[in-house]
Amino acid sequence: MKKLFAEQADTLKVMTYATDIRPITSPIPLSQALEGVQGLDWSLCPDTELTVSGVSVSSIDIEDNWLFVAIPGLVQHGIRFLHAAVEAGATAVVTDREGSERAREMNPDIPIVIVADPRRASATIAANIYRHPASALKTAAVTGTNGKTTTTYLLRSILRSTFNDPALCGTVEIRVGDLVINSEKTTSEAPEVERILALAREKE
C-alpha cells in the first residue's frame, strides 16, 4: 500500500495524532453548540450563552473555551479527569447524571450540562461547533470484517484520477491534503472525526 503514495512521500507533513487537528472555527453560544442534543438538563448551568470554540472527550485534548464531555467508561467515569480538563481551559462540562453529581463535588463552580448519553451528545456538539463539515463533502464508508483498510487505499488511489486529493480516515492513518496523521485508535471519537472532516473542507 505504501507504493500507492510513494510519489507524495517528499511533500507530506506528518502530524502525530488526530487530536492534534485544529480546524478553523469561531466561538458559538453553548446553547447553539448543544442544539439537537436529546434529554438536556440545564439546571446546573446558569449561563447558556457562554461561548465555546471546541469540544473533546479527552482531558488531554482540551484548549481554552472548549467543552469537556465526560463519558462513563467500563472501568471509570470520564468525570474523574475534570480537574485536568479545567486546568487545560475547559469552560463547561457535559456529562450524565452520575458524572454531574461527582462534578459538583469536585468543582462546584464549573457549569454542568446533563445529558442522557454523553457519547452520542459529543457527536452532535462537534458537528455544531465545526459547522457540519460532512454536509459540504462527498463521503463514503467501507464496512466489513476483513480488507477494509486495503479497500480504502485502493479506492483513494482510483478517486485521485478524478478528484484533486481525496481525504482518507482509517485504522492505520489519516490523510488530508499534505498531512499524514497517525491513527491512535481503531475508531476515532466523534469530535475527532468532525475535526478531520472540517480540515478536509478547509483543504478543498
Question: Which functions belong to the PLM regions below?
Answer:
Residues 37, 121-204:
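Phosphate-binding loop of NTP-binding sites
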Residues 2-124:
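N-terminal leader/targeting and accessory segments in enzymes
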